[in-house]
Every structure is written in structure tokens, then in C-alpha cells.
């Protein structure tokens, strides 16, 4: 155990503490100013209540049955910029989100499938990470990393690395692997290929969709919220969320979030610690709008239960007890990130706006990793230790001009944008030999000694990746916006330089360019119904060629063949009557895959995976006091051109052939402020190899909860209790793309919290 401690990077505690002290001082100033505004706020609140009472009386006069229809009046929304889509009814869902460089868009007005999940949902479900949020969407599979705790995703059957989640439309700014939700206002899921709007992500993932996060902003109403929470088995946390606006017209805003949580998780002996601090400043003038977001996050996991490598198993074994930790005490990870983003836009005229943003981050990670590798079907395995320090520095930018003009009966909405991201990574490694273990009876293994490693244990340069693209779009609207046609083109470049412990690897370099189009159409035959179709593509750099294939040298070993060019066609229908809405979509995405041609022993994009699917999502409040959030995805993921021709027509690795999510809330009438919640998730089977001889069974998980909002004088108190995996199901949740690792679902866990607003 002493060896484990000695191998860690020095702990950096001074900066976060100083930052917390500075924020505390700022909060004291904010609190003092809030007392001065209390009388004004009280008057405004009384006016709101009077208005609401009048509206209710009017509704009573006009109703013809026992059903009460509640339609929320949406606030002013400027499409194309950074203003967030107004929330839907109770505030948990927004029907739209960021469409890359096209900015925030209402889903009813664009030929794409996009939805946003809000901070209210995050709070009500006590969702601590992005994975906790997107589990509400059947189009998204939660997938884990390669022997580490990283949260990856699979959208429409294709992988999205956690490193490739965007922040305000910028890649590479967020913490990697796991992102805390404490500073997040929106989690937006764009479903489908997205090269035209987003370009190439740093890792090249996101063929089937993208996740974007938007930061919290100070609202018009002053906010001071203190939250205390508890989670199984002994995690305790506290959070502070403060927002204020200043100026004659409330043009200046400040939002501060502070979080700390630590303790043992529901998995035995696995201890987790999270610290996150963020500050968001913004200015909203008549013509200029700007914002600055800075943040710090540190996450530590000790005695971590990682994935299980399939290894020599010929069948997928039954999962162990859901709480059993088959990791070892020396397995840990420490991840620390400092990041920031600056965004601005300026209206040069009534019809034209220039915009720009820039962001950067530094990620530092160190850890001792060890995942059991099965040697037979009885749970026997071997485990070895891998030490990997890792450093990544990223910077990204976006700029352009958007506007609109008319040519006769046609309105043109034009956007010209340029985006770029650049990332450098450094790493080192050492590893031990193998030790025997068993996933059902892991025992205790001492810290294994190093037997091999890189020349230097200080992280050395391993890669440099730069991606940039110039995009032009024109959305033509006619017939009072009942018909719109989106046309666009993007010129995308990518440059990759790989290194071997700081030494350039000329074979692993790439300089490539692709031009990718977009065309989509939206037709509104009725006020509440929209029909749409699109063709859009995805781009990403391929992997380096292997050095050997079937015991023979590969001709272009180590080389990157070029850019993988995937294509999507989609049609769908959307419905929205401001009480409830939804989308039904049918799509096909084809993606080339890398493989060695047996005839020439040359590596190239000779393979192909084709995913065809149907998506359905429904949200809203069809009956007053009853809210629904449900979705379903059916996929036919086929290997149309496999490395082994005998596998042609088989299902792709790791893609569940269906996933169903049914969530709901019910306001209990007899107790004002009391709400019962529940979510059922059903996932279909997944194959763990291309031969389709290894298969993960379908699984079902039930989550239940209750919350109670207790009004108090000048404050409100909200109690929340959630139980995840109520029946404590044992199941293998997912398998990663190569079929190497399977990951076990989390055990039953209790979450409790109380929040006070004052």
C-alpha cells in the first residue's frame, strides 16, 4: 500500500483552497446585496402571484370539462445564438438545443433530432454525472472505458468518447472521463451524424450523435441554494449555488457553484471523492452579449471496480454479486481539470450578428489500473497492474457571422462559421506481471512489482491533433415558414502527429481534407406537426495500421489511411402542442471500418458497418399533475463488410438491438408539493464479438423516487429520495466496441438530499 502512495503525483491542494476562499468572500458580498433587494423581490413575487391567480380564474371560466390545460408562456428566444431554448412546461426538458456552429435552435424548426435535459431534471433525479442524465434517453447507451472509469456513450449504435463532449459548442474544454453536473444548466443530445455542424472531435468519435453541455447563468430572480446529500454506502456531500444580477437593467450576472462529495459508494470498499468549483459571469446588453466561464474539478476513485476483460472465456459468465468489488485496493485514479470559456456576440445591424468563442483546458490524470482478464468460464482470471500518468492540453475556438435577408417570397438565414480545436497529449507507463484472481472470489493481491515500462516515468509527448473547418449554410424559408430547406457545405481539415515518448513517428502522421455537405427539409402541414428529412455526414481520422496480420507484416504498418467518411439519411415527424410533444425518426448510418486486405496485406477502410433504426421519444404533461418522459430505440446494426467474410450480416459488437426508457412523475393530490417519480430502463441483448458467439443478456432496471417541496417563510425546502436499481439486479450493462471488456451495472443505491433556497 505504501508503494501505491509513493507512485502518485504530488497532491495540489493549495490552489483549490485559495479559490474556495476567494469565492466565499465573493458570496459574502453577494449575500449582503441580496438583502437590499429583498423588498423589491417580494413586490415582484406578489405581482407574479396576482397574475397567476387571474390566469387561473380565466381558465376556470373557459373550461368545458374536468381537464385543466396549462400552457406556459415562453420567454423571448433568439435562435442561432447562445440563449437557451425555453424549457418545456415543468422545466425538466427543452425541445431543442445547440446545433453546432448554428447555435441554439428550436427542434420544431430544424430538420434534426435534438433534445435538452435541464438542471431541474439533474436536481430532481440527483444526477451526479452526465451518464446519470442521458440514461433517460433510449438513443444513448452508457458505455465504460478501457479498464478505467471513463464514461463513454453509444448514440444510434456508434461510440462517443467522454473526451469528445462539447461545452458551449467547443470541443476539448471539459474535464475528461467523468463530468460533474454541478455547473451544468443543460445536457443537450443531438442524435445523428454531425460533421457539418461540429466538425471532427479530438478523438474522432460521435458518428451517431453528440452531447453538448451548457453552463449555468444567473437568472432574473436572485438565487442562494444550499444542498446537503447522502448516497450509499457512506457518501456525504454539500453544494452551494448562488446567482445574482446587477446593473440598472440587470445586465451583469454572476453564478457560482461549489461542490464537495466523498465516501464509500454502493460497491464495497470503493471510495470516491469529487470537488468542483465554477464561476459564470455574463453581460447582456442591447446589442452585445458576452460571458466567461471558469471551472475546476478533481475526482478521485480508490479501490476501483473496473471492467472485466473477456480474455479466454468462451461464454459470457454470470455477473458476480452487484456489490462485490473484484478490483484490488491499489487500483485508483486521480483526475484534475482546470478549464475556461469566453463567448461573445454583437449585433452589427438588425439582421446581422457576429459571434465568437474560445475555450481551453488542462487535464492531469494519474492512476494504477488493473482489470481481471478471464482465463476460463468459471470466473478464473489474471490481473496485472498498469500505471499511466497522462496530461492533455486543449484549446478550441469558433467564430462567424449570421444573418437573414429576403429574395422575393423566400427568406434566407445564412451562417458562415469557422471552428478549430487543438490538443496535445503526454503520457508514460509501467506495468507488472500477472497475478491469479477470480471475479467471484477475488481475494487480496499485494501491490505488484514493475516488470516493464517506458523509458521515462515523466509524461512525454504522445500526440498532437488539430482539426479545423469552414462552414457555410443557407436555410431558405417560404410560405410563412411552413416549408424550409437547409443547404450547406463544410471544408474540414485534420492534422495528426504521433510520437513515441516524445520522438516523432513519421508513419503515424496524417494531413487530410474532406468536403462534407448537408441538405435537409422541414415541412409543417399543420400548426403542431412537422415533417423533416436530412442527409448529413460524419468525419473522423482512422486508426493506425497494425504491424502484423495473421503472422505477416502489414505493408503500411503504423500509418493512418485517412479520414473515415460516414453517411446518414434520416426522415421523421415531430409533434408539439405545448403540453406534450415527441419525435419519431427513421435513419440509416453507414460507416467504413479499418481492416487488412488479406490479398494485399494492406490496411485500409475496406470494412463497413450499417446501422438502421427507429427512434421514438415522448415528453410533456398530457394530464395535469402527470408528466412523462419516455423513449424507445430499435436498431439493426449490421456488419455489411467484416474482416472475416464469414461474419458478414452479423450484428455489430456492443450495440443493443433495442432500448426502452419509460419515466414519469405524479403529483400526489392529497399532499401539496409531494411528487412520486419512477423510471424503467430495458436494454436488449448485445454481442461481444463479430462472430456473434458471445452475447450479453437483456436487462431491466427500475429506479424510484419521491420529493417534497415544503414552502416556508421567505424560503423553500425540498427533500428528495431516490433508489436506483430498486431490485438490485445483477447484469452486464455494456461491452466496449472492440469486444475486449464488459462492464457490470451498478448495485442498488439510495440517494437522499435536502435543498434550501433563500
Swiss-Prot record:
Organism, scientific name: Yersinia enterocolitica
Topology within the bilayer: Multi-pass membrane protein
Localization per record: Cell outer membrane
Keywords attached to this entry: Cell outer membrane, Ion transport, Iron, Iron transport, Membrane, Receptor, Signal, TonB box, Transmembrane, Transmembrane beta strand, Transport
Motif (TonB C-terminal box): 741-758
Keyword Protein biosynthesis: no
Lineage: Bacteria, Pseudomonadati, Pseudomonadota, Gammaproteobacteria, Enterobacterales
Domain TBDR plug: 106-216
Family: Belongs to the TonB-dependent receptor family.
Main location: membrane
Gene Ontology terms for molecular function: siderophore uptake transmembrane transporter activity; signaling receptor activity
NCBIfam families reported for this sequence: TonB-siderophor
Signal peptide per UniProt: 1-36
Gene Ontology cellular component annotations, sorted alphabetically: cell outer membrane
InterPro entries in the cross-refs: Plug_dom, Plug_dom_sf, TonB-dep_rcpt-like, TonB-dep_rcpt_b-brl, TonB_box_CS, TonB_rcpt_b-brl_sf, TonB_rcpt_CS, TonB_sidphr_rcpt
Protein name: Ferrichrome receptor FcuA
Motif TonB box, residue range(s) on this chain: 66-73
Pfam families: Plug (PF07715), TonB_dep_Rec_b-barrel (PF00593)
Amino acid at each position: 500500500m505504501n508503494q501505491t502512495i509513493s507512485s502518485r503525483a504530488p497532491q495540489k491542494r493549495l490552489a483549490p483552497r485559495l479559490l474556495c476562499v476567494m469565492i466565499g468572500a465573493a458570496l459574502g458580498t453577494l449575500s449582503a446585496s441580496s438583502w437590499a433587494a429583498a423588498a423589491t423581490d417580494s413586490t415582484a413575487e406578489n405581482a407574479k402571484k396576482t397574475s397567476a391567480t387571474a390566469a387561473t380564474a380565466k381558465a376556470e371560466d373557459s373550461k368545458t370539462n374536468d381537464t385543466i390545460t396549462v400552457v406556459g408562456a415562453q420567454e423571448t428566444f433568439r435562435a442561432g445564438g447562445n440563449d437557451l431554448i425555453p424549457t418545456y412546461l415543468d422545466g425538466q426538458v427543452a425541445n431543442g438545443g445547440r446545433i453546432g456552429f448554428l447555435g441554439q435552435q428550436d427542434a420544431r424548426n430544424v430538420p434534426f433530432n435534438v433534445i435538452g435535459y435541464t438542471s431541474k431534471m439533474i436536481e430532481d433525479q440527483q444526477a451526479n454525472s452526465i451518464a446519470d442524465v442521458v440514461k433517460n434517453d433510449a438513443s444513448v447507451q452508457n458505455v465504460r472505458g478501457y479498464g478505467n472509469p471513463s464514461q463513454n456513450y453509444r448514440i444510434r449504435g456508434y461510440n462517443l468518447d467522454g473526451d469528445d463532449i462539447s461545452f458551449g459548442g467547443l470541443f476539448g474544454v471539459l474535464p475528461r472521463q467523468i463530468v460533474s453536473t454541478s455547473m451544468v444548466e443543460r445536457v443537450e443530445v443531438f442524435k445523428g451524424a454531425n460533421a457539418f455542424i461540429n466538425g471532427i472531435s479530438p478523438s474522432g468519435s460521435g458518428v451517431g450523435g453528440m452531447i453538448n453541455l451548457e453552463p449555468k447563468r444567473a437568472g432574473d430572480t436572485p438565487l442562494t441554494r444550499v444542498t446537503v446529500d447522502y448516497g450509499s454506502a457512506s457518501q456525504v456531500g454539500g453544494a452551494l449555488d448562488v446567482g445574482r444580477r446587477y446593473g440598472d437593467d440587470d445586465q451583469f450576472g454572476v453564478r457560482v457553484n461549489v461542490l464537495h462529495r466523498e465516501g464509500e459508494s454502493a460497491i464495497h470498499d470503493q471510495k470516491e471523492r469529487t470537488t468542483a468549483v465554477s464561476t459564470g459571469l455574463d453581460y447582456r446588453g442591447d446589442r452585445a452579449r458576452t460571458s466567461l466561464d471558469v471551472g475546476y474539478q478533481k475526482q478521485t476513485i480508490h479501490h476501483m471496480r473496473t471492467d472485466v476483460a473477456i480474455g479466454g472465456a468462451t461464454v459470457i459468465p454470470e455477473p458476480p454479486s452487484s456489490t462485490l468489488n473484484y478490483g484490488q485496493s491499489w487500483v485508483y485514479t486521480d483526475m484534475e481539470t482546470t478549464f475556461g470559456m469566453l463567448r461573445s456576440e454583437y449585433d452589427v445591424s438588425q439582421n446581422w450578428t457576429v459571434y465568437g468563442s474560445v475555450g481551453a483546458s488542462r487535464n492531469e490524470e494519474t492512476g494504477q489500473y488493473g482489470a481481471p482478464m478471464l482465463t476460463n468460464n468459471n470466473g478464473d482470471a489474471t490481473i496485472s497492474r498498469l500505471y499511466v500518468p497522462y496530461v492533455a492540453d486543449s484549446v478550441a475556438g469558433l467564430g462567424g457571422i449570421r444573418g437573414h435577408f429576403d429574395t422575393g417570397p423566400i427568406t434566407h438565414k445564412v451562417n458562415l462559421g469557422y471552428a478549430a480545436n487543438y490538443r496535445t497529449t503526454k503520457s508514460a507507463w509501467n506495468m507488472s506481471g500477472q497475478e491469479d484472481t477470480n471475479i467471484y472470489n477475488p481475494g487480496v493481491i499485494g501491490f505488484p512489482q514493475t516488470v516493464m515500462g517506458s523509458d521515462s516515468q515523466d509524461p512525454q509527448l504522445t500526440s498532437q491533433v488539430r482539426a479545423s473547418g469552414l462552414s457555410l449554410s443557407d436555410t431558405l424559408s417560404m410560405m410563412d415558414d411552413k416549408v424550409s430547406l437547409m443547404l450547406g457545405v463544410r471544408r474540414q481539415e485534420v492534422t495528426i502527429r504521433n510520437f513515441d515518448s516524445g520522438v516523432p513517428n513519421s508513419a503515424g502522421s496524417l494531413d487530410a481534407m474532406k468536403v462534407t455537405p448537408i441538405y435537409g427539409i422541414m415541412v409543417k402541414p399543420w400548426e403542431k406537426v412537422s415533417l423533416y428529412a436530412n442527409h448529413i455526414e460524419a468525419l473522423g481520422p482512422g486508426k493506425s495500421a497494425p504491424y502484423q496480420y495473421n503472422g505477416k507484416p502489414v505493408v503500411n504498418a503504423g500509418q493512418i489511411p485517412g479520414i473515415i467518411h460516414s453517411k446518414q439519411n434520416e426522415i421523421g415527424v415531430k409533434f408539439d402542442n405545448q403540453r406534450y410533444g415527441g419525435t419519431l425518426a427513421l435513419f440509416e448510418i453507414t460507416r467504413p471500418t479499418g481492416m487488412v486486405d488479406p490479398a494485399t496485406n494492406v490496411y485500409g477502410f475496406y470494412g463497413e458497418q450499417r446501422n438502421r433504426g427507429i427512434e421514438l421519444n415522448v415528453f410533456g404533461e398530457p394530464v395535469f399533475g402527470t408528466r412523462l418522459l419516455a423513449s424507445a430505440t430499435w436498431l439493426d446494426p449490421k456488419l455489411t463488410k467484416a474482416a472475416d467474410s464469414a461474419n458478414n450480416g452479423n450484428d455489430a459488437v456492443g450495440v443493443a438491438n433495442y432500448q426502452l426508457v419509460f419515466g414519469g412523475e405524479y403529483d400526489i393530490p392529497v399532499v401539496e408539493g409531494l411528487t412520486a417519480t419512477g423510471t424503467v430502463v430495458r436494454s436488449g441483448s448485445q454481442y461481444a464479438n463479430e462472430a456473434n458467439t458471445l452475447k450479453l443478456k437483456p436487462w431491466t432496471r427500475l429506479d424510484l423516487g419521491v420529493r417534497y417541496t415544503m414552502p416556508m417563510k421567505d424560503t423553500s425546502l425540498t427533500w428528495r429520495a431516490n433508489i436506483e436499481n430498486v431490485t438490485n439486479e445483477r447484469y452486464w450493462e455494456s461491452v466496449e466496441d472492440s469486444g475486449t471488456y464488459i462492464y457490470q451495472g451498478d448495485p442498488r443505491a439510495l440517494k437522499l438530499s435536502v435543498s434550501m433556497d433563500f
